[in-house]
Regions:
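Metallocofactor- and cofactor-centric catalytic cores in central/energy metabolism, strongly enriched
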Residues: 1-136
Length: 136
């Protein structure tokens, strides 16, 4: 970690929704935590990334962005849409956030499991048009 960033952090927030049930959100949290752990363990980032949870509603997004704005240690936010997270759910929160934003447009898995892919996998791992809308 670069000394200039030792008292700062970047927040990682995952977007999802409860459409697919609580079990899916638990899996989303696991994937998100693994990504953040991997980022921090890589030694490639000059700053610590802190997982702040999965936002499943407009209120949760707005609350997280308000907290990010108020926290002097937070210098920016990384967002990742794991399951289908409607872009409109993020509008108010993005209007609150004035710190730098990085949006990851990717999936959790390194490889797509073409041979075993089913609708449960698709529902858990899609971000679909909500992710694309969010990026704009």
């Amino acid at each position: 970690m670069i000394k200039a960033f030792e008292n700062h952090e970047i927040w990682f927030v995952t977007g999802a929704q409860l459409l697919y049930g609580g079990d899916a959100v638990v899996q989303v949290d696991g994937h998100s935590s693994a990504m953040v752990d991997g980022m921090n363990a890589s030694g490639l980032l000059p700053i610590k990334v802190v997982y702040k949870g999965t936002a499943n509603s407009s209120k949760e997004v707005a609350d997280l962005m308000t907290a990010a704005e108020a926290d002097k240690k937070c210098v920016g936010v990384i967002t990742w849409m794991h399951t289908f997270s409607p872009a409109k759910m993020w509008i108010h929160g993005m209007q609150i956030l004035r710190k730098p934003l990085l949006h990851l447009h990717t999936q959790f898995n390194k490889e797509i499991p073409w041979d075993t892919m089913d609708m449960d996998f698709m529902n858990l791992n899609q971000s679909a048009h909500g992710d694309r809308e969010y990026a704009h």
